[in-house]
Curated annotation (Swiss-Prot):
Belongs to the rotavirus VP7 family. The keyword Metal-binding applies. This is Outer capsid glycoprotein VP7. It comes from Rotavirus A (isolate RVA/Pig/Australia/TFR-41/1987/G5P9[7]) (RV-A). Glycans are attached at N69. Keywords: Calcium, Capsid protein, Disulfide bond, Glycoprotein, Host endoplasmic reticulum, Host-virus interaction, Metal-binding, Outer capsid protein, Signal, T=13 icosahedral capsid protein, Virion. Some rotavirus strains are neuraminidase-sensitive and require sialic acid to attach to the cell surface. Some rotavirus strains are integrin-dependent. Some rotavirus strains depend on ganglioside for their entry into the host cell. Hsp70 also seems to be involved in the entry of some strains. Residues 237-239 are annotated as: LVD motif.
């Protein structure tokens, strides 16, 4: 009997020793993992910077108030500035060093020469097909043309606002716009857009779904089209898809790092007629048209006032980014 009790006690003691050894081994292993992880974090922390998304715009509610979401403070002078101008400006100036001259003048306003970029574009139509706004602050000069008021207004609406867009398959599906912020945006070398509104039985209202010639033409051979139809009504669309792409888009709010300067014209183009566009005339401005040198001198003089009406953003805009998330 005593032998059995001794064996039980011995087994119990051996188990305690084994468990104690096991716990110490686990503790050492965990300490090793934790210390190594902390060491890696400490080593990488100085070279890793959190992404700065600039401004948060709420998906619902008021779009007027931006909320700061900056993870680091940067000196104003470290920002980049892009100035977009029509190619005719460079042609009229006819000076190979005009950009260097403007860079030196902007330096007097506090903008280092390496932070300012000049980008020309052929015309409003071609610029609207592939807008590329990559700088922290982007100023777009558009020379007023009475024959291009609609194109100028649509381009301003596109680049002064953020859009969330998805592809449309018009061969398989009908589409409807859910509210005033919902638009169909088309881009391409030639966009002709026709629509046929449908009733609840999917029969055409004033048109035949099998005859595209009976569709209503809302745009003809344009490069940029922002289409607005009656909300809550299904539509069958006909689009020149070989030369144009169309996306179903939702206007999210203002793109605060872009300003449009209208060169010439009696009044600033009004893009606020759309109920979804908050008044933003402070970022849609006009300068008197004289000569391009005079225009650029005016921009240099007021560049800091213009930038103060904007907000620095980290998100760039190009045609691909526009289509899926701006």
């Amino acid at each position: 009997m005593y032998g059995i009790e001794y064996s039980t006690i011995l087994t119990f003691l051996i188990s305690l020793v084994f468990i104690n050894y096991l716990l110490k081994s686990v503790t050492r292993t965990m300490d090793f993992i934790i210390y190594r992880f902390l060491m890696i974090v400490v080593l990488l922390a100085p070279i890793i910077k959190a992404q700065n998304y600039g401004i948060n715009l709420p998906i619902t509610g008021s779009m007027d108030t931006p909320y700061t979401n900056s993870t680091m403070s940067e000196t104003f002078l470290t920002s980049t500035l892009c100035l977009y101008y029509p190619n005719e400006a460079a042609t009229e100036i006819a000076d190979t060093k005009w950009k260097e001259t403007l860079s030196q003048l902007l330096l007097t306003k506090g903008w280092p020469t390496g932070s300012v970029y000049f980008k020309g574009y052929a015309d409003i139509a071609s610029f609207s097909v592939e807008p590329q706004l990559y700088c922290d602050y982007n100023i777009v000069l558009m020379k007023y043309d009475a024959n291009l008021q609609l194109d100028m207004s649509e381009l301003a609406d596109l680049i002064l606002n953020e859009w969330l867009c998805n592809p449309m398959d018009i061969t398989l599906y009908y589409y409807q716009q859910t509210d005033e912020a919902n638009k169909w945006i088309s881009m391409g070398s030639s966009c002709t857009i026709k629509v046929c509104p449908l009733n609840t039985q999917t029969l055409g209202i004033g048109c035949s779904t099998t005859d595209t010639n009976s569709f209503e033409t809302v745009a003809n051979a344009e490069k940029l089209v922002i289409t607005d139809v009656v909300d809550g009504v299904n539509h069958k669309l006909d689009v020149t898809t070989n030369t144009c792409t169309i996306r179903n888009c939702k206007k999210l709010g203002p793109r605060e790092n872009v300003a449009v300067i209208q060169v010439g014209g009696s009044n600033v183009l009004d893009i606020t007629a759309d109920p979804t566009t908050a008044p933003q005339t402070e970022r849609m401005m006009r300068v008197n048209w004289k000569k391009w040198w005079q225009v650029f001198y005016t921009i240099v003089d007021y560049v800091n006032q213009i930038v103060q009406a904007m907000s620095k953003r980290s998100r760039s805009l190009n045609s691909a980014a526009f289509y899926y998330r701006v």
